[in-house]
């Protein structure tokens, strides 16, 4: 599923607004120990963002890359912009930036993905954040994760993923190191418990 499909969707699918939490045995290195927020799911497939993989880039790096600021000029950003988190959202279009954010900011290009969360992938929101005028809660993700028709359903059926309702606090929490463990804890399990179960299956 692509971003254009997300824009044109007419109804929500079963996994919309869910977390996917990788099972401990996940062999795909792109997704091992990941927590993914599913933004769209339909018969055509699914799309979402990994929310616990840090990026080495800073928000200043992004602004320089987009020529919004110049290296030779003094760089003065609001505190919230200096600390703005950049994450790896997935292996598809990994050079493209997407901003998941609270619904207190909206532009013509913002796409609602839940009652409280929107997705914007244009320069307007980057400019707003750089000026301290962006949404109260947001994170930038480079790339996204995508599944074709029936692919995600098969992976879940084959015990590749756990699923649970998404938690907005966890989506925007900037502490990434133990987010996987906290997502599992929210379901009342640990990675060790799941590994032991798999070993006895």
UniProtKB/Swiss-Prot annotation:
It comes from the Bacteria. Pfam families: DUF179. GO terms for cellular component: cytosol. Gene3D superfamilies: VC0467-like (3.40.1740.10). InterPro entries: AlgH-like. Signal peptide: none annotated. Belongs to the UPF0301 (AlgH) family. This is UPF0301 protein RHECIAT_CH0001061. It comes from Rhizobium etli (strain CIAT 652). The lineage of its organism: Bacteria, Pseudomonadati, Pseudomonadota, Alphaproteobacteria, Hyphomicrobiales.
């Amino acid at each position: 599923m692509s971003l254009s499909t997300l824009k044109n969707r007419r109804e929500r699918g079963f996994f919309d607004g869910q977390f996917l939490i990788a099972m401990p045995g996940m062999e795909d290195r792109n997704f091992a120990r990941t927590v993914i927020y599913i933004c769209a799911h339909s018969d055509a497939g699914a799309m979402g963002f990994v929310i616990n993989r840090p990026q080495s880039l800073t928000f200043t790096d992004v602004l320089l890359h987009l020529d919004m600021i110049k290296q030779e000029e003094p760089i003065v950003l609001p505190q919230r912009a200096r600390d703005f988190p950049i994450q790896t959202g997935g292996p598809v279009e990994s050079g493209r930036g997407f901003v998941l954010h609270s619904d207190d900011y909206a532009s013509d290009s913002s796409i609602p993905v839940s009652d409280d969360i929107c997705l914007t992938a244009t320069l307007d929101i980057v400019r707003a954040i750089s000026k301290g005028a962006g949404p109260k809660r947001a994170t930038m993700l480079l790339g996204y994760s995508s599944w074709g028709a029936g692919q995600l359903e098969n992976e879940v059926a084959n015990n590749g993923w756990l699923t649970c309702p998404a938690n907005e606090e966890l989506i925007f929490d900037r502490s990434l190191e133990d987010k996987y463990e906290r997502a599992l804890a929210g379901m009342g399990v640990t990675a060790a418990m799941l590994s032991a179960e798999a070993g006895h299956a």
